[in-house]
Amino acid sequence: MEETILQTEFDSVSRQTEVGHSFKRKTQTIDIEGYTTELVERDGILFAKKESEISYPKDGNETFFKIEESSFWFNHRNNCIVEAVKKYCPNNHFFDIGGGNGFVTKGLEENGIQTVLIEPGVQGCLNAKKRNLKNIICSTFENASFPNNSIPTIGLFDVVEHIENDSDFLKSIHTLLKEDGHVFITVPAFKSLWSNEDVDAGHYRRYKLKDLEHKLKNAGFTIEYSTYIFSILPAPVFLFRTIPSKLGLYKKSNGNDKHKNAHKPKKGIIARVLNRIWKFELNRIRIGKKMPLGGSCFVVARKKWA
């Protein structure tokens, strides 16, 4: 029954697909059966045999698909991720869990990092297919039935804040990783920046860097690198999101328009200032130095040897 429902949704949405963007480097197909045999292939996408509920807006993937390519936020986050992966483990298969429309997966592939997208939302997987991605799994990582100690590298990019019991989730990620495997994580920073935007996005929390590090250590990881990124964003987020939410002035607007305005490319002197800040942050990541403040936390952790 669940498989029939999933097939109906897939068929309905797949009629909307079109040819997407080309790659700088050709995407290579990864032998997913070397990791799990519990998936069913349909039209180039591997599906789990069951579905699970997730804390994410139903139209979230489609909304962000329209803005990711031009968004300063998505592009800078991608650049930060690529720099870190190239520094800490560039040669392993990378599993982008909860990877949405495949924007991060695409960025990693363009930089020669063979990547598997794992995304539970059908629309996100179809959007990833438009981007010519070859290794797409429509599933939560739990439903994909990967064996313990099987995955070399995992990315959780703005995923953990959507998980109600994040401590148990991180322990399950630790179990999934091979010995000495890495996990790369981004999450929204600072509880003091909480706003109705977080509620709308399906977030359970925001993090201080030390709190995320503590949870990872309790799950059995060692911290290889940690920093804040988007160092300029806390002030505008507090002024234009947090304060209006606390004062009851927040107005829920059309999601597409709201995100389009927030993520639109900046011009003139603002663009030049932001570009300087982004270059500074990328250089800090490249040389393994921290930034003391930012709108997001970024952590690279390693599974300790038993």
Annotate each predicted stretch with a short phrase.
Residues 167-182:
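A short glycine-rich, Lys/Arg-flanked "PGG" loop and its adjoining helix->strand segment in the class I
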Residues 221-231:
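Conserved S-adenosyl-L-methionine
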Residues 163-167, 187:
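A structural helix-start
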Residues 65-67, 183-217:
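Short, glycine-/aromatic-enriched active-site segment of Class I SAM-dependent methyltransferases
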Residues 89, 109-110, 164, 178, ...:
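Short conserved AdoMet
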Residues 236-276:
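C-terminal helical/coil "lid" or tail adjacent to the Rossmann-like core of SAM-dependent
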